[in-house]
């Protein structure tokens, strides 16, 4: 199975989960709170750069919540996603004519069509960035803006989380055996997730975008905390700190996600 097929399968299986994340205005879990923060930062960047009525493409639109929110705020929005399940959900709940299945490496719109692009939680699942950056630059108008997120490669919490996940999957056969001995309910076995999830260092990422005609104009980092241990820590405190220090250069290395707002140079 190719990388794109794996990603498509993963997100098609979790459509309802993602819908619940975005529909909950006050999510309890830290991971969900950080998704809400990411969306808020992206909207703030778009509103700071583009007037109402601008044409916006949400690449990797998922269930369509962000595109719908931007439309509610007065933008002319479209959405594309690799997952048929995600697009079906967006069409059912929002504008049917504005969502379609498409690959970020082959965006189905003409050159210089959009004033803005939002691309949240997409780049890390690609094999390479080159084609995606080239396509975003192509469909942006000269001077158009894109807001793109990438996970940070230096966030310490990421490595803690990965270790905890591996431990959890390693001990699952043992916990299953104990549960059987005690006559408890059996849970279906789940394989360790194999979908790739690349991470980025700011300097290298900025250089790569610049080499594809995308000049950095704004930058923020967010999402603090270890998801694997979130039940043991005050989640609200982590999220408040993440929001407060989103543009603090000394503390950005702690955050797990990076948002870059870039302008298309043509």
Pin down the residues of each PLM region:
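A conserved beta-strand element that flanks and buttresses the S-adenosyl-L-methionine
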Residues: 118
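A C-terminal cap/extension of S-adenosyl-L-methionine-dependent methyltransferases
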Residues: 168, 179-198, 202-210, 216-266
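A short glycine-rich, Lys/Arg-flanked "PGG" loop and its adjoining helix->strand segment in the class I
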Residues: 130-142
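Class I SAM-dependent methyltransferase SAM/SAH-binding core
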Residues: 63-106
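Conserved class I S-adenosyl-L-methionine
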Residues: 1-50, 53-60, 147-177
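Short catalytic micro-motifs in class I SAM-dependent methyltransferases
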Residues: 121-125
């Amino acid at each position: 199975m190719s990388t794109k097929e794996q990603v498509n399968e993963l997100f098609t299986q979790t459509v309802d989960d993602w819908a619940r994340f975005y529909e909950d205005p006050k999510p309890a879990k830290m991971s969900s709170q950080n998704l809400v923060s990411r969306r808020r930062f992206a909207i703030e960047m778009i509103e700071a750069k583009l007037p109402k009525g601008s044409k916006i493409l949400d690449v990797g639109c998922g269930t369509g919540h962000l595109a719908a929110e931007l439309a509610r705020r007065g933008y002319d929005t479209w959405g594309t996603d690799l997952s048929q399940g995600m697009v079906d959900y967006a069409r059912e709940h929002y504008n049917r004519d504005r969502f379609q299945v498409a690959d970020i490496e082959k965006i189905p719109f003409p050159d210089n069509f959009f004033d803005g692009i939002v691309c949240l939680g997409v780049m890390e699942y690609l094999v390479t960035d080159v084609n995606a950056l080239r396509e975003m630059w192509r469909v942006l108008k000269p001077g158009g803006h894109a807001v793109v997120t990438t996970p940070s490669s230096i966030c310490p919490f990421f490595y803690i989380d990965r270790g905890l996940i591996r431990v959890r999957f390693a001990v699952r056969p043992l916990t299953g055996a104990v549960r059987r001995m005690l006559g408890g309910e059996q849970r279906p076995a789940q394989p360790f997730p194999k979908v790739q999830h690349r991470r980025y260092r700011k300097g290298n990422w900025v250089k790569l975008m610049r080499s594809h005609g995308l000049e950095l104009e704004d930058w923020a980092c967010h999402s603090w905390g270890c998801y694997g241990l979130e039940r043991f820590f005050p989640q609200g405190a982590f999220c408040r700190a993440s929001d407060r220090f989103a543009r603090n250069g000394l503390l950005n290395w702690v955050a797990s996600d990076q948002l870059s707002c870039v302008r298309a140079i043509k």
